[in-house]
Amino acid sequence: MDYTSEIAELLSRRGFRRFMMSRTQVGHLLLAGHLDDRPIDIVLDTGASKTLVELTYCRSEGIAVTDTGQVGHGGSVYTLGDARLTLEGLPVRTDGIFAIDMSSTNQRLVSKGIDPIRAVIGQDALRYHQAVIDYATLALFLKEQPA
């Protein structure tokens, strides 16, 4: 018996919105979103503690970043300040949007003919929005009014 539609209906009644995902060639779950007014593909990463954007992408798009003085993922960590990340118009609540250099990861992806990662939704957003991931239908459910 297929319970996926019942799950979706229950979550909808409880104030969740459904966002459809796709899989990349290496299995990453991918969402379509916006960073301010720019369309951007976003990888859902349950292992990432924070939501982030690739530093080279920020620089190529003229997105202002500020060095936090912290080090992570092999380099400096930057913040995007008041940048706004949205999924189908829903503002994604985070602990702040950070930027890191993901060039080593992206070089490996590109060498395999796979698009580079531009942004990642991490555990901060998933926690605030009480995320439910339905792997059977590749759907992400986020509570519209975050906790």
Regions found by a protein language model. Give the residues of each.
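Pepsin/retropepsin-fold aspartyl endopeptidases
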Residues: 1-147
